[in-house]
Amino acid sequence: MKIKVKLPDGKEKEYDRGITPAEIAKELGVKKAIGAVVNGELWDLKRPIENDCELRLVTLEDPEAPEFYRHTMAHILAQAVMRIYGKENVKLGIGPTIENGFYYDFDIKNGRLTEEDLPKIEQEMKKIIKENLPIERKEISKEEARKLFNNQPYKLELIEEIEGDRVTIYRQGEFVDLCRGPHLPSTGIVKHFKLLSVSGAYWRGSEKNPMLTRVYGTAFAKKEDLDNYLKFLEEAQRRDHRKLGPHLELFMLNTEYAPGMPFFLPKGVVVLNELMKFSRELHRERGYQEIFTPLIMNEQLWKISGHWDHYAENMYFIEKDEERYAVKPMNCPGHILVYKSRTVSYRDLPLRFFEFGRVHRYERSGVLHGLMRVRSFTQDDAHIFCTPGQIEEEILGVLDLINTIYSQFGFTYRVELSTMPEDHMGDEAIWEKATTALKNALERAGLSYKVNEGEGAFYGPKIDFHIRDSIGREWQCATIQLDFMMPEKFNVTYIGPDNKEHRAVMIHRAIYGSLERFFGILIEHFAGAFPTWLAPIQVAVIPISEKHNDGAEKIAKRISQEGFRVFFDNRRETLGYRIRQAQTQKIPYMIILGDKELESGKISVRTRTGKEIKDVDLEHFVETLRNEVLSRKLELLMEG
């Protein structure tokens, strides 16, 4: 029987059913093929093709290649661990690819791996790569699989959850794994890898299950790419907010008494207040009204909103006076109650409510991560209530606000628009009109965007913003979400020109997203060296010796009186130590004062990067500092 295969150049060819991409690659002269994409699915090079399809061969240069070779590298890792520790002593978990790498989970009898074990595992992996073992894909019955993995309890659990009667296994040498693939044709194709770290991970992510040992690694087709990535990881580690935050006395975490709930220290609160002050100024200019809604509200509210049915496992509850209350996981129901507290006319719209609302959401302890993944956080939440005809202009206004805020921190960003899914609620005509309004606003704002067809929430289309930090990482922060569900559930209406009730449109939006998470991103973006307007301490005044203390203190007070955050460092430490301390604390400016400065009335200024500016008039410095802070400059003006 023949099948038709359509190639990327549009040509169709007929082949015998069961032909493999490897045979097609040989015919086409593509010697470097490592796999294929068949009807959009990643496909092993030696896997037979049974039906008509579109086919594109994959080489190591293609964007799909890492999925093949990193998946194979995860199997090489597992094979190496079983060789070293003994097949009978190692129970295998799962070993998927992840962004920029892979991992494998192990349950090892009589002990756990540590990072000290990684070099010997790498050496064994190199041997397996050198052996260049052929990798064979095979479909077997579940009964055969149960016998094959009879000493692998985690694999047996996975087998029972797979639909159908057959499963896929992969074999390389003596190693066999339950796996969907895809994989390389053999173990020797990609040689450039590095094992990165070891951590604990509960089986299936549940604290009720055994703790396994997770080994992370990465792999690249080219050594140069691997080396560059390892340098990137070093830089990311240097910027890690979990290290910098406590070092700079910005925040602390207490996993014993408040897991996932950060404590912000005085210096951190300064930064948070500056972020909120900046945001409030912009919101006031744009006609937003700030409100504050209760942290705890009756269960009936959450039943109406749907959170009770669909989100209860992520919520915290309180029972008092035979009434049940929930700590709010979201701000929107509270904003709706404010809207509904009076009759709203079409003349009142749009109404823009804004809140720095503290919310609580339960997250498993295993996924908590510094400020990035927490259980208690503050959202810069706003809800816009408007008529259908006002959607486009309101979205345009939000886009401008987002751009203004992100530009202030030096962020670039990319935009994604997610449209109506199959399981949507509401009339399709309303969806189409709303989606068109979002597209028009994006185009009027001059923003390029990617469309994710059918990936919107069931209650409305949305726009997501992914900001890029100073080392190129992306973070999803701002969201603009149209909501057709909440106005229905809460009967959110306005009185129209016809004196009748009409359904209002509700737009959710957040820009920082989580204030805590945004703070963490900023710490890493600036490597702790905040621009002066954000810096917890803006100026350190350092007398050279005790005899200069009085004069230095007067200068410190003069600068402080102008509203700047000043640290007068007259500690009985060496001058060099105090300067180094100011630099490690990332203080933008240091004023060094000795005999010469106090006699001349001129100051010596040193920036945190080490640049020295001598004979500076104090009033000139104050004025420069004022301009730098008021205009929220990213750079230090005294370095210009």
Swiss-Prot record:
**Sites where the protein binds Zn(2+):** C332, H383, H508
Q: Which cofactor(s) are needed, names only?
A: Zn(2+)
Has UniProt tagged this entry with the keyword Zinc?
Answer: yes
From the UniProt record, list the coiled-coil ranges.
none
Query: Per the record, what are the reactions this protein catalyses?
Result: tRNA(Thr) + L-threonine + ATP = L-threonyl-tRNA(Thr) + AMP + diphosphate + H(+)
Q: Please name one Pfam family that this protein belongs to.
A: tRNA-synt_2b
Task: Give compartment(s).
Answer: Cytoplasm
Q: What class of enzyme is it?
A: ligase
Q: What keywords is this UniProt entry annotated with?
A: Aminoacyl-tRNA synthetase, ATP-binding, Cytoplasm, Ligase, Metal-binding, Nucleotide-binding, Protein biosynthesis, RNA-binding, tRNA-binding, Zinc
Q: Which CDD domains match?
A: TGS_ThrRS (cd01667), ThrRS_anticodon (cd00860), ThrRS_core (cd00771)
GO CC annotation, single: cytoplasm
Q: Which residues form the TGS domain?
A: 1-59
Give a GO molecular function annotation for the protein: threonine-tRNA ligase activity
Say what the protein does.
Answer: Catalyzes the attachment of threonine to tRNA(Thr) in a two-step reaction: L-threonine is first activated by ATP to form Thr-AMP and then transferred to the acceptor end of tRNA(Thr). Also edits incorrectly charged L-seryl-tRNA(Thr).
This protein's name: Threonine--tRNA ligase
What organism does the record attribute this protein to?
Thermotoga sp. (strain RQ2)
**Organism taxonomic ancestry:** Bacteria, Thermotogati, Thermotogota, Thermotogae, Thermotogales
Q: Which gene encodes it?
A: thrS
